[in-house]
Amino acid sequence: MTQTFRHLNKYNIPGLRTFEYTKIVGIENIEFGTNIIIDDFVFIYAKKKIKIGSYVHIASFTSITGGESFTIGDFSGLSSGVRIFTGSDDFTGCHLGNPTVDEKYRNVHRAPVHIGRYCGIGANSVILPGVTVGEGAVVAAGSVVTKNLEPWGIYVGNRKIGEKDKVAILNNIENFLLETGKNLEKSNNK
């Protein structure tokens, strides 16, 4: 059975499916691949460069904020409620932690976040500034990720609990692209 999407391409970008309540601020700073779905109630704040690969799904109630760059590779997904922070106040010591006070009283840590190709981030997970999620890694629901994650690992928070089958996954992607007649490199260069 074929799934039907009731989407609006309110941003008029080929290969991007958005919905009525998708909110993207700074869309001119975003580079899109193809075959991307960004659900209702997603909020993306693109003050700096954001790159979203091809065949990426960003589920409802996800937010990407913080004022620094973010990338997510091909065939990756952010499940419902994921929070990507590329910037965060330092709540330790004597700093005030909110944007209503002058910058001189705050200590904001900003750093790019990178999620590699073939990754999955589980529902309600939090990825903090400066984190790189290696190619093929998956993060369990409800995780808080504060450190870089190695490729092809299965993680609960920062703790590795297993390995994914890299060869099988890459074979599946190759078969998908062959069966559908898609060429990932060409679609990413558009």
Locations of regions flagged by a protein language model:
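Extended, small-residue-rich solenoid/repeat segments and analogous flexible loops
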Residues: M1-N35, G181-K190
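Generic hydrophobic, helix-prone segments enriched in Leu/Val/Ile
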Residues: L8-N9, P14-G15, K23, F41, ...
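Short, highly charged low-complexity linear segments
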Residues: L16-R17, H95-N98, V138-V144, N175-K190
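C-terminal/domain-terminus segments
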Residues: I44, I127-L178
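Hydrophobic transmembrane signal anchors and adjacent membrane-proximal interface regions, especially
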Residues: T2-R6, G116-I121, V139, L184
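Flexible, glycine/small-residue-enriched loop-and-beta-strand segment within the central core
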Residues: E20, V25-F32, I37-I127, N158-A168
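Short secondary-structure boundary/capping segments
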Residues: L8, P14, D74, Y105, ...
